[in-house]
Design a protein with these regions (language model features):
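Conserved helicase RecA-like core
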Residues: 3-392
């Protein structure tokens, strides 16, 4: 385990005090990271010392930057870039996460010189461009299946890998990637640094820990409850036929420039986008029936602030991590109170305030009462019967 710090010591930790160089500190500031999350504070120093890591942390805890920053720092210190084969391999369970992790490497490494080349490889798209892209890559972020495909095509080799990151290892196992992970690990050099992150610590993860990690530093970040005090919550009681107009009314009257809208189905998501667009609101949907490239493009535009509204289903939204998101709207309520807190926790992060809005039909009333009870917080409900939605 890492040595515990006093609360006073924790409050004094900065990205500079963690040992990061000026180019990375500049990128951190540009990405509006104010101070290190607990997982970053505890993981960055031992990773820089070459230690193996067993990190127990959930999505949204800041774990991606906790390994991206020290890996980039090591490249900056050694200047060993541009080799024929990658020296860092990051394995992830999904295409969305592969794309996001690669984005974080690129965003935080923007000021490094020489440049560090990061490539994301995943299924669902043509393998041919990826076969070209991995040539000369310093960092490869990959889903296990596509990486094996590339190895079978002799597009790359893993003999130069010095750092292996297993991100969301529990999810990779849950998705049935155990055999692929074992095949890949067998092709890696034995003398390497291994960093494993998992949301949970079960028997399967414990087995991986024993077989892959060498005297690891164990970091367990107790899931910080979503800081509901930073999130302004409000609900609007509305007739089902008026939900669409009310959504458009709220986006326009509150002048929302970046809002994540949750819908219960792909059909609802697509219908919302059509009607939002007709009303002059820039919107796009992200869900399982969209192609991978479309989903990636939508997410990139939304994160960059070039898309006003992103409509998502729960399934596709789980891996989405967006800094300083000001608005979340539940067009449809989620099935469970836990999912509700997870959704609204997309805003109110990094000590920034946010607003979460829910549209409640008469059929939702009982369910919303249960959500409030489980959350331990009463949400103001506003009646919209007399609200003039003509023209929306």
């Amino acid at each position: 385990m890492v040595d515990p710090l006093s609360e006073a010591e924790k409050s004094k930790v900065t990205f500079a005090s963690l040992g990061l160089s000026e180019p990375l500190l500049k990128a951190v500031e540009e990405q509006q990271y104010t101070r290190p999350y607990p997982i970053q504070r505890d993981a960055i120093p031992p990773i820089l010392r070459g230690k193996d890591i067993l990190g127990i942390a959930k999505t949204g805890s800041g774990k991606t930057a906790s390994f991206v920053l020290p890996i980039l720092e090591l490249f900056h210190r050694t200047k060993t870039v541009g080799s024929r084969y990658a020296s860092v391999l990051v394995l992830v369970p999904t295409r969305e996460l592969a794309s996001q992790v690669a984005d974080v490497f690129q965003q935080l490494g923007v000021h490094l010189f020489p440049k560090v080349k990061t490539v994301a490889v995943y299924g669902g798209v043509s393998i041919n461009p990826q076969m070209q892209a991995v040539h000369g890559a310093d960092i490869i972020v990959a889903t296990p299946g596509r990486l094996l495909d590339l190895l079978d095509q002799n597009a790359l080799r893993l003999s130069d890998v010095e750092i292996l990151v297993l991100d969301e290892a529990d999810k990779m196992l849950a998705l049935g990637f155990a055999d692929e992970m074992n095949q890949l690990v067998d092709r890696l050099p034995k003398n390497r640094q291994t960093i494993l992150f998992s949301a949970t610590l079960g028997d399967a993860i414990d087995e991986i820990n024993k077989s892959l990690l060498r005297t690891p530093v164990t970091i367990e970040v107790v899931e910080e409850a979503t800081n509901l005090e930073l999130i302004e919550q409000v609900a609007y009681n509305v007739d089902p036929t008026r939900k669409g107009p009310l959504l458009r009314y709220l986006i326009k009257t509150e002048q929302m420039q970046q809002v994540l809208v949750f819908a219960s189905s792909t059909r609802t998501a697509d219908n919302l986008v059509v009607k939002l667009t007709k009303n002059g609101i820039q919107a796009a949907a992200i869900h399982g029936q969209k192609g991978q490239q479309v989903r990636t493009d939508v997410l990139h535009k939304f994160k960059a602030g070039k898309l006003q509204v992103m409509v998502a289903t729960d399934l596709l939204a789980r891996g989405i991590d967006i800094q300083l998101l000001p608005y979340v709207i539940n067009f449809d309520l989620p099935r469970s109170p836990k999912d509700y807190v997870h959704r609204i926790g997309r805003t109110g992060r990094a000590e920034a305030t946010g607003k979460a809005i829910s549209l409640i039909t008469p059929d939702d009333e009982h369910h919303f009462k249960i959500i409030q009870k489980k959350m331990g917080k009463r949400v103001e409900q506003i009646d919209t019967t007399d609200l003039d939605l003509q023209g929306y």
